[in-house]
From Swiss-Prot:
It comes from Borago officinalis (Bourrache). The record marks 300 as: Transition state stabilizer. Keywords: Calvin cycle, Carbon dioxide fixation, Chloroplast, Disulfide bond, Lyase, Magnesium, Metal-binding, Monooxygenase, Oxidoreductase, Photorespiration, Photosynthesis, Plastid. The modification N6-carboxylysine is found at residue 167. One of its GO terms (cellular component) is chloroplast. This is Ribulose bisphosphate carboxylase large chain. The active site is at 141 (proton acceptor), 260 (proton acceptor). RuBisCO catalyzes two reactions: the carboxylation of D-ribulose 1,5-bisphosphate, the primary event in carbon dioxide fixation, as well as the oxidative fragmentation of the pentose substrate in the photorespiration process. Both reactions occur simultaneously and in competition at the same active site. Binds 1 Mg(2+) ion per subunit.
């Protein structure tokens, strides 16, 4: 069975048992009345069952309801169908004040019907020939308004300075100021020029997201013809059907696939309604993507450390034990489905590097947009600063130093041989994002 953990807030006067049963019925075989066609099938074989209910500590009228769904309710290899069944209609139920899908357990038999990420972590490292450290990226800013030529110039400067990747922002598609074909051409030119000068393999996430699947695939085909290593998709606004289509194309044609989670907070930010990001992360691993944005813990976006590390493990590891202290409600076995690299991006700069390396480890992408392009000396020095402090942190960690405790000292020591890093450290020494988390663990 597929197991689901729902956070249920019933309307006043509705007992939790009734609310849980209603959720199970509405998201499987039930409707609001008995119908004569019920007798034409075996409802016991197909209906969802609410098998356990826990009260949420500290909340007066919230419950975690566990529901089991028989596998025959779902089309093989379709995240679209899975979500249509489990959360397609039930969240608007009048008997519920709010409903949030906290977690899913996907059984191995169903996991095996998905191809998952186009390539996975190890294959990506082999393609890039980069090992033993996190990968470095940068989102080109301003996100909208640059001409294709100026955009390509910024890409070149960042890659030449030492970054592994640069990135289209999520809302860069094909606007009047920069049509997609022009952007692809100038970025490919920048990428090859930077590769020739540095001797390293470089990439730029060319956003193939479009208004329809045919146009999306046309853009991916053009990227492949240019010989670039990676394309990008906004998987929530684009939809799971489009995402799986693009993932299959990338797998067949040797392209890596970077995934942006634009629109996720509309779905996952409220604590009592919607769907937690760990569910969206699991769905992405099934649908297909080699990278996905996961929050930073230390930057400008919402996400506590334990919760974030919980779904980072769900993205990367093959077997993840149940651990409510990290928000993981079920043990998940991915039966060797390739892993996804988490991307830490959003309001991070050189002073965050020790914490990011300590939190995310080597199998991650650390992406500094303003933290590269905001350098007072320019884009290339910003990239140099990030590469120097990253390599200093990795070396210090490998020597046995404690990044959490000695991180600031490690960065200061590295400034002695990098004036670019010294300038970056001075500019961002007082920039912090300290706000209370909205989504906290109950346990």
């Amino acid at each position: 069975d597929i197991l689901a953990a729902f956070r249920v807030t019933p309307q006043p006067g509705v007992p939790p048992e009734e609310a849980g049963a209603a959720v199970a019925a509405e998201s499987s075989t039930g409707t609001w009345t008995t119908v004569w066609t019920d007798g034409l099938t075996s409802l016991d074989r197909y209906k969802g069952r609410c098998y356990h209910i826990d009260a949420v500590p500290g909340e007066e009228n919230q419950y975690i309801c566990y529901v089991a769904y028989p596998l025959d309710l779902f089309e093989e290899g379709s995240v679209t169908n899975m979500f249509t069944s489990i959360v397609g209609n039930v969240s608007g139920f009048k008997a519920l004040r709010a409903l949030r899908l906290e977690d899913l357990r996907i059984p191995p038999a169903y996991v095996k019907t998905f191809q998952g990420p186009p390539h996975g972590i190890q294959v990506e490292r082999d393609k890039l020939n980069k090992y033993g450290r996190p990968l470095l990226g940068c989102t080109i800013k301003p996100k909208l308004g640059l001409s294709a030529k100026n955009y390509g110039r910024a890409v070149y400067e960042c890659l030449r300075g030492g970054l592994d990747f640069t990135k289209d922002d999520e809302n860069v598609n094909s606007q009047p100021f920069m049509r997609w074909r022009d952007r692809f051409l100038f970025c490919a030119e920048a990428l090859y020029k930077a590769q020739a000068e540095t001797g390293e393999i470089k990439g730029h996430y060319l956003n193939a997201t479009a208004g329809n699947c045919d146009e999306m695939i046309k853009r991916a085909v053009f990227a492949r013809e240019l010989g670039v290593p990676i394309v990008m998709h906004d998987y929530l606004t684009g939809g799971f059907t489009a995402n799986t289509t693009l993932s299959n194309y990338c797998r067949d044609n040797g392209l890596l696939l970077h995934i942006h989670r634009a629109m996720h907070a509309v779905i996952d930010r409220q604590k009592n309604h919607g769907m937690h990001f760990r569910v969206l992360a699991k769905a992405l691993r099934m649908s297909g993507g080699d990278h996905i944005h996961s929050g930073t813990v230390v930057g400008k976006l919402e996400g506590g450390r334990n919760i974030t590390l919980g779904f980072v493990d769900l993205l990367r590891d093959d077997f993840i034990e149940k651990d409510r202290t990290r928000g993981i409600y079920f043990t998940q076995d991915w039966v060797s489905l390739p892993g996804v690299l988490p991307v830490a991006s959003g309001g991070i700069h050189v002073w965050h590097m020790p914490a990011l390396v300590e939190i995310f480890g080597d199998d991650s992408v650390l992406q500094f947009g303003g933290g590269t392009l905001g350098h007072p000396w320019g884009n290339a020095p910003g990239a140099v600063a990030n590469r120097v402090v990253l390599e200093a942190c990795v070396q210090a960690r490998n020597e046995g130093r404690d990044l959490a405790r000695e991180g600031x000292d490690i960065x200061r020591e590295a400034t002695k041989w990098s004036p670019e890093l010294a300038a970056a450290c001075e500019v961002w020494k007082e920039i912090t994002f300290t706000f209370e988390e909205v989504d906290k663990l109950d346990y």
